[in-house]
Design a protein with these regions (language model features):
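Short, surface-exposed polybasic-aromatic patches that bind anionic ligands, especially phosphate groups
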Residues: 26-360
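Bacterial N-terminal signal peptides
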Residues: 7-18
């Protein structure tokens, strides 16, 4: 449900619904969801950009388009301010299970293509998870990038000679996540694929997900997405245009090596056999502590750290501990040395306030 926005002061959105998640038994008085009005103002003031063909994400044209794209409504979990949310009672133990002394890091992994509203749709053969996939056809462009393209390949001497078509067809290995992401801003649709691969007879993938960017609707309970938690990926990555602007106004995603056999809103799926309550669930939300001093970091890293204080980051998949997702855009500077100064102990796990009702 799209709601009216109040832009004169901090945007407040009152939502009603029946998805109470872990709030059962708590005080159910109404909680007012908060979102940043500057985000809405930025989107509304952006000059509309014509999209006449597929636009690679790592271009100035894509930067201009993304400035005016609203990835889900203002009251969506990705766009909700959580600075005042309470700390989870088991926060310390969950932090320790991941590694309190381990550094924050990132994978320069995710890539996407922006397509026009009339992009030709093609079939994608879904193999591993057809019962938890959305049906096609899909507007997959010929130049859709596969996870890691281009930066992860161009910065590796052993992979530098590979072309996009090589990567689309499975080089250097099919044994990888190979996420493929397609954004259709005009129709407000997001298409995400797990292990997307081009073959002589068309495209294949192990899973396909379609998200309505005008809606807060989740995937069906128990369903995966191209991410293990059942969440979308594109709203969660750090992009070049955001680093250049100096503001990231959404939550981020990260991975942990060991997660629990459970999920919490807004996740819909788990990917573990472990039941230890000290392990984080898929969808667990972490926030950088308010007292963490960001003043000595570069402008780009400050924008990431401020976002982690204001919006936090969700456990979205299994992988390297404390690893966020940054776009595989070779315009993004190397940030590893700075981010490694942030440790697991600088975070806290948060939980939704009493009376919070997930938006529909």
């Amino acid at each position: 449900m799209r709601l009216a926005f109040i832009e004169a002061c901090l945007l407040t959105v009152i939502v009603l619904g029946d998805r109470s998640g872990e709030l059962r038994g708590q005080d159910q008085s109404q909680y007012v969801i908060q979102s940043d009005p500057a985000r809405i103002a930025r989107i509304k003031s952006a000059r509309p950009q014509p999209i006449t063909g597929p636009v690679p994400y790592n271009t100035p044209a894509a930067d201009a388009i993304m400035a005016g794209v609203e990835l889900f409504p203002a009251d969506n979990p990705w766009n909700t301010l959580i600075e005042d949310w309470p700390v989870h009672p088991n926060s310390r133990r969950m932090i320790e299970s991941i590694g309190a002394t381990k550094p924050l890091r990132y994978n320069q992994d995710m890539a996407f293509v922006i397509v026009p509203p009339d992009q030709r749709k093609v079939e994608v053969k879904i193999s591993a998870y057809p019962d938890e996939s959305d049906r096609g056809p899909f507007p997959v462009a010929d130049n859709v990038p596969i996870e890691g393209w281009p930066a992860s390949f161009r910065r590796d001497p052993a992979l530098r000679a590979l072309t996009l078509q090589d990567v689309q067809r499975g080089k250097p290995s099919l044994d990888a996540d190979r996420h493929g992401i397609v954004l259709d801003p005009a129709n407000r649709r997001l298409y995400e694929f797990y292990r997307l691969t081009r073959t002589d007879v068309g495209w294949t993938a192990e899973q396909s997900s379609v998200f309505d960017l005008a809606s807060n609707k989740l995937r069906p309970d128990g369903w995966t997405s191209s991410d293990a938690a059942g969440l979308p990926i594109l709203p969660a990555i750090v992009r070049h245009d955001e680093l250049k602007r100096g503001v990231i106004d959404h939550a981020l995603r990260f991975t942990v090596r060991r997660s629990r056999r459970a999920y919490v809103y807004p996740a819909t799926h788990f990917a573990s056999r472990l039941t230890d309550e000290n392990l984080p669930r898929m969808g667990e939300r972490f926030r950088l502590r308010k007292d963490f001093d960001t003043s000595s970091f570069s402008r780009e890293v400050q924008s990431i750290l401020v976002a982690l204080k204001r919006y936090g980051m969700f456990v979205a998949d299994n992988g390297l501990d404390w690893a966020m997702s940054v776009s595989a855009d070779d315009r993004v500077p190397v940030l590893h040395d700075e981010l490694r100064r942030v440790k697991g102990s600088d975070f806290e796990v948060v939980t939704a306030p009493a009376g919070y009702v997930p938006p529909r």
